[in-house]
Amino acid sequence: MINSVLALGFDDTKFNWSDLTPIAVEHKKLSSENENNVNKAIDANTSVIGIYASHDIVSASGLIGAFLTIDAASLLGKSSVGNDDQWVKDAGALRDLLRVTRTLKSEQKEVITKTLGENAYSAFNALIASASRQTKTILVGPGAIALGFVALRSNSKLKDYLLVANTPVVPAITEAIKFMGSKVIMNTKENVHPLAELALAVSAVKASEL
């Protein structure tokens, strides 16, 4: 039974959680304290951990693509932008990033921080802590899904507790989800506020338990 949510890394200044769900939520920014935040929340019977790391498709694809043999253009997919000039720019940036990440893929912390930043490694550790304690962990956005992908490459036992909130229309993310085998809660492919996406996903999971 879902009674409360710990939301890590979400911006709660532009969206009112209670507009979508009455379930209690606690917010924490991404920091080195996140693993401790997760353990404390679970000890206090929090039932869901939501994680958001980044909405940057190039960065997330750079992390996922480090472990794949797919080229930059195919990882991005033509439909990911819809603007040819921006797509060419993104494909070039991703190609350059992959040259770096593919040499770092054996160094977990380095490849995560190089793509998604220092705080993303804190989110990664929080994600592992949550799933290891058999707590539903909802991944929102490309960055969090990429972190889940990396986590499952190291520990497949986490799969049953990692849930993907929604499916972005980007091949790199699709490939990651396919490898993970995790449940995708929604398949709207709509671009909504990350916190709204978490609220909708939590409500869907709660409804499925009734």
Would you name each region that the model predicts?
Residues 1-210:
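N-terminal loops that bind phosphate or other acidic moieties
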